[in-house]
A protein has these predicted regions:
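Terminal low-complexity/charged segments
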Residues: 1-181
């Protein structure tokens, strides 16, 4: 938290010098950088990160695939409740085996519109990752072929990895389990 500061609204912001915001040195990343001028590029601890607007996610992902990022390694989300202006962030890990480089995509997602385009048409491996992120965070992936819960029962109320999810010692009765007496 040393590289972050609190503004008057109580929102943590990254300090200006915390991350490098330079043209990526790797030629594959530099090509994407030039193609997408609205994407913010960061590099910290040898990790290349692109902050992609959610309406450009599918276009950027398709360009990344064509540039050689053939593997989607991971897709998840982060809930920054009361820490940032934009509450959620979808985080996507891509890998280029042929160029030996990784790229992390961070997609800001506002709480009042938790919708992001699905990456399944570009990376079929995103299927179960998106279902898990929907199940745990409530982020909806538009055009997903089967956006249903994957870990919790269909009748579960809420999304347990949200910071405002109520926790407590209330016994949970699942519809398929025997009654607890």
């Amino acid at each position: 938290m040393a590289d972050e500061k609190m503004n008057e609204g109580g929102v943590v912001e990254e300090a200006a010098g915390a991350l490098e915001r330079l043209l990526p040195e790797h030629p594959v990343l530099a090509g994407l950088f030039e193609q997408f001028t609205d994407v913010e590029w960061r590099r910290s601890s040898e990790q290349h990160t692109a902050v992609v607007p959610k309406d450009r996610l599918r276009d950027f992902s398709l360009a990344a695939l064509q540039a050689g990022f053939e593997m989607l390694v991971d897709l998840t989300a982060v809930d920054y409740l009361r820490l940032r202006r934009v509450r959620f962030e979808v985080v996507v890990g891509l890998l280029s085996l042929q160029h030996n480089v990784r790229l992390r995509l961070r997609v800001p997602v506002p709480a009042d519109d938790p919708n992001v385009p699905s990456l399944v048409p570009v990376y079929p491996a995103a299927n179960f990752f998106e279902r898990e992120t929907f199940d745990m965070f409530g982020i909806v992936f538009g055009d997903h072929p089967d956006l249903t819960r994957i870990l919790l029962p269909e009748d579960w109320v809420g999304h347990p990895l949200r910071k405002d999810f109520a926790t407590g010692a209330v016994p949970v009765q699942f519809k398929s389990s025997p009654q607890v007496t």
